[in-house]
Amino acid sequence: MEQKPSKVECGSDPEENSARSPDGKRKRKNGQCSLKTSMSGYIPSYLDKDEQCVVCGDKATGYHYRCITCEGCKGFFRRTIQKNLHPTYSCKYDSCCVIDKITRNQCQLCRFKKCIAVGMAMDLVLDDSKRVAKRKLIEQNRERRRKEEMIRSLQQRPEPTPEEWDLIHVATEAHRSTNAQGSHWKQRRKFLPDDIGQSPIVSMPDGDKVDLEAFSEFTKIITPAITRVVDFAKKLPMFSELPCEDQIILLKGCCMEIMSLRAAVRYDPESDTLTLSGEMAVKREQLKNGGLGVVSDAIFELGKSLSAFNLDDTEVALLQAVLLMSTDRSGLLCVDKIEKSQEAYLLAFEHYVNHRKHNIPHFWPKLLMKEREVQSSILYKGAAAEGRPGGSLGVHPEGQQLLGMHVVQGPQVRQLEQQLGEAGSLRGPVLQHQSPKSPQQRLLELLHRSGILHARAVCGEDDSSEAGSLTSSDEDPEVCEDAAQATQPLPEAPPRADGEGGGGGS
């Protein structure tokens, strides 16, 4: 007698049950366990505990096509509509199958009819193009909410207090009054001719070469730039209140860093140049061959990274103050006082950044990282230069001379002048040599006698002056002219973001 086929053979869903083994019960049991395990994670909060699918009675995972269903019935309904499969479904038992989580894969037609009966909407099933468009819209909404959240968080961040505004005004005025060419540096700059600094001609003892013509050009502008850094520091009350010994140590430590920062914020990506002292635009190789060595690479890379920040004069000024009041300089006497001063500038800096409301995500921590890069690039960029004179800086000795890296005081200056045979004519920050008439000394002597080297006094003392007194630019016509050009208004409380990026300069 012919056996009546069981309901299990009625058209099953090949996508859900394609790997059935001959032992149907065992396979279904494993499938149920797998589904239960995979769906045991996130459950929407609007569902009751252990709420069941309205189609098959399995554990529901949310609203799908207007009904509370499980993942299996959601997928079955979506595939059926997208591929237009329901006209091909059939039932061997007159559409009388009972659909539950055990039998749901045994009859596609009855399962689909139950989906329709409980209210699942066919019009909510999207084709591939509509589904892609919907996902894109979802991503756009998420991005919009993220930006709105960022704006709300910016509005809630603290802005400068009245006391901090006073600190900000002083630092900004100190920077602008010692900032050559001000915000007009692009209009007033002159490009160093391409033939200068491109062909190193003087060999150094360490094997590197220096272009004397480029070195001569840098000498003319870097020496006044050092004086401007000193003048900037002296205009900060917190700095002026420190002992002279600490002032000297801080200036020796930060001079190169501040000058590098002032040059970096005047990086021009169009010409790939840095503008030194607000007047001379130089290329990377020109700066390198002029005596700065590998440090020039660090300054150019810093300029490229800072160009995206669009810093204004106040932000450059506060960043310089943070670099100046650094407690990691060895030999400081008033470490606690300097640390408190730096914290005050850091807090004012952070609040001013909040006030400007930059559109760059995480602007403040990123800017602090750049501040550390200024220091680390100067301290460690040249570490790979094996045993180069000038230590880990990677700066040639004559480059250190120009940048005021090693400042010696009055009696030492006169002693070195006598060693060079030019007593009384060489002043200011000079390189402290280990022995008379070293190769580096002979090069300095050659440069000085050629009229190339002319250093200003930045920090010195003699028998007739107060010990450790710092020279001022009050009588320097060049610096006075620079100060007269600083006509931009200081930021008000709250100030208007003046926005011309790259406000700093040597």
Curated annotation (Swiss-Prot):
It holds the Pfam family Hormone_recep. The keyword Transport does not apply. GO terms for cellular component: cytoplasm; nucleus; RNA polymerase II transcription regulator complex. A zinc finger (NR C4-type) spans 53-73, 91-115. InterPro entries: NHR-like_dom_sf, Nucl_hrmn_rcpt_lig-bd, Nuclear_hormone_rcpt_NR1, Nuclear_hrmn_rcpt, ThyrH_rcpt, Znf_hrmn_rcpt, Znf_NHR/GATA. It is found in: Nucleus. Zn(2+) 1 binds at C53, C56, C70, C73. Residues 1-52 are annotated as: Modulating. This is Thyroid hormone receptor alpha. It comes from Sus scrofa (Pig). The lineage of its organism: Eukaryota, Metazoa, Chordata, Craniata, Vertebrata. The gene is THRA.
